[in-house]
């Protein structure tokens, strides 16, 4: 949905084979990446739940069984939490859920993918982090903490994969015109970064030679001091 759907569609149009992990399989019926709209063998769809590690394992196994391997992983799942620093008793579950989805699930997926990325000789990991992984605005303590942790993971993966020609790119947008931003009234939707823009950036990163892959791309659709 949103960013992920646009990235997948862009890569299909560019001739790449893709393996998509999504929680709601039914949501892809009739969409731009519905497998029925593409030649056989171009796209496989897998059930993926960020809170269930077994679904990540099955996703990778299905991909390797179908394609023989893979060279890129793009992480764009996430959840918005409004839990503040002075959280209420009982909010701990929300905090842990946010950390599990925005941080640990991505760690699990990249760890499980690591050997395949090494084997490819030019592995690429792209992570949709957020400007909230670079600075904290307001009092979204749970969300910002999860994104700061994710940025730290990206830096560590970059270090770990450097000699194996694995390159990591952390994309850090502010508001993107997706369902997550649908209730934002302070900024017109047309003034936000569009999902298609993120897809274009990902496409460019995947085409770049190893020596030119950027680690961090910060995107501001609104002015920040």
Language-model features, listed with the residues they occupy:
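Rossmann-fold cofactor-recognition segment
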Residues: 38-53
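Canonical Rossmann dinucleotide-binding motif of NAD(H)/NADP(H)-dependent dehydrogenases/reductases
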Residues: 1-17
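Conserved mid-core segment of classical short-chain dehydrogenase/reductases
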Residues: 57, 80-96, 139-142
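Active-site helix of classical SDR
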Residues: 110, 146
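Residue(s) in the substrate-gating loop at a strand-loop-helix junction
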Residues: 130
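C-terminal helical subdomain
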Residues: 163, 170-171, 187-225
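Active-site-adjacent segment of SDR/Rossmann-fold oxidoreductases
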Residues: 135, 156-166
